[in-house]
Amino acid sequence: MQIERIKGFRDFYPEDMEIEKFIFETASSVAESYGFKRIDFPSLEYIDLYRIKSGEELLNQTYSFTDRGGREVTLIPEATPSTVRMLTSRKDIAKPVRWYSFPKVWRYEEPQAGRFREHYQFNADIFGPSNEEADAEIISLASGILDGLGLSGAYEIRVNSRIMMEDILNGMGIADPYTVFSIVDRFHKVSKETFVDDLMSVGLSEENSNTIYRMCSEASEPGGISGLFGSGKVSKAAERLIRTIDILKEYGVKSVKYDFSIVRGLSYYTGLVFEAYDKSGQFRAILGGGRYDNLAKLFSEQDIPAVGFGMGDAVISLLLKSKGVKAPHAKKSVYVCRVGTVKAERIASISKMLRSSGFIVSAEIMDRSLSSQLKYASYEGCEYAVIAGERDLENNSVTVRDLSTGEQEIVTLGDLVPFLEKSTSY
C-alpha cells in the first residue's frame, strides 16, 4: 500500500536541502555578524502561551491537543512567545539581547504556493531598547539576509506604524482604530467594494472609507509620510518612523516604502510593523515583523521592549528558484572510482586523504563498471572522478577526470591534493 504525504507538509530531497541549507547558513551568518546569538526551544508548548495575546485567528490554526497527562498543548505556530518565555524566565541576562532561532512551526491553514502547514522560520529579536536605533537595526538585518541570499535589488521593504495609524484614524474621528486594523489587514484579499463596505459596516463614513482605501492602495516614498497629516502637525510616531528610515539609509538599506496597508495580523504589535516583498509581485510577503513592547509583561512583571521579525523558508525558497539563484558549493566534490580488482582498503585510504584535505568525497561501493560509476558521479553533481585502477596504483598514481570537460590526467597520489586544489574548472 502506498501511503501518501500529509497535505500541507513537505518532503525534502537532497536537491531541496541544498537550497534549505543555503538559507539557514546565510541567515545565521548574517545574524551573527550583527552580534545575534542562536537559541532554540521545544516544538511543544502549553496552549496558554498563545491564548495570552496571539489572537483568536492564530489559536484556530494551531495543532493543539490534550496530552495523556491532561495538559492542553500545541505544536508551536510561531516563535515569538517561546522566545519571550525563555527570556522572562531568567533575570540575569544583560540587555540588549540579540537572539535568533530557526525552528519548525505549524499552522493548520489552507496550503498554497509558499504556504504550508509546516515550515521552517528564521526569527530574530532585539530585547531591551525601545528606540528607533533598534528598529532600524532589525530591518537592516532582514535586508542583509536577503542581500546575502543573492536578492539585492529584487525586493522592497514596506514600513508602517500602528501608533501613527491610530493618530491618522483618530484625526478622522474614528474612535476604535483596532477594528479598522483588522479590516485593513485583509486589504489585499478582498475587492474594493468589499473593503469599503466592511469599513462602513463598523461605522465609518463613505468618505473616510474611500480615503482609507486610497491610502492602502499604493506604497509611497517615505517622504510622503508627513503629507498624511494634511495641514496638521506630524505626530511623534510619524517622526519616529521617519527617523528610522533615515537611519536605514545610513545602513545602506535601499528601496524602503511607506505602506498604510501593512498592519501585521498578530495583536501584540505595538508600533513599527514592516514586511518585505518581491518587486515582481509574484509572491506574498517574504518576511515580516515589528515592535512588540508589551508582550513580556504578559508573561512576567518585567517590562522589556522588543522588536523582531520572522522569515519562512517556503516563500524564500520559491523566490530563489524563480530568480535562478543556486546554492554555492564551498568545496570541490570528488568521486573515487574503483576499477577491476582494486581492494576496498585502497579506495578507503584515498577517500580519507581527500576528505582530510577538505574535499567532499563519495566512493564507489557497488562494484559497477567504470562507465556506470562515471555516469553516477555526474548525476550526483561531482566535479571530478579519481579513477583508481590497478596499473595506475602500481605506480602510486590515479587518473583524475574533469567531469565537466571530460579531460583527464594521470596524477601521483602525492600530488593529488594540490592538483585538485589548484584546478580552475570550478
From Swiss-Prot:
EC number(s) recorded for this UniProt protein: 6.1.1.21
UniProt-annotated location(s): Cytoplasm
Domain of life: Archaea
Keywords: Aminoacyl-tRNA synthetase, ATP-binding, Cytoplasm, Ligase, Nucleotide-binding, Protein biosynthesis
Pfam families in the record: HGTP_anticodon, tRNA-synt_His
Cystine pairings recorded for this chain: none
Record's catalysed reaction(s): tRNA(His) + L-histidine + ATP = L-histidyl-tRNA(His) + AMP + diphosphate + H(+)
Family, per entry: Belongs to the class-II aminoacyl-tRNA synthetase family.
HAMAP family to which the protein is assigned, alphabetical: His_tRNA_synth
The name this protein goes by in its record: Histidine--tRNA ligase
Annotated source species: Thermoplasma volcanium (strain ATCC 51530 / DSM 4299 / JCM 9571 / NBRC 15438 / GSS1)
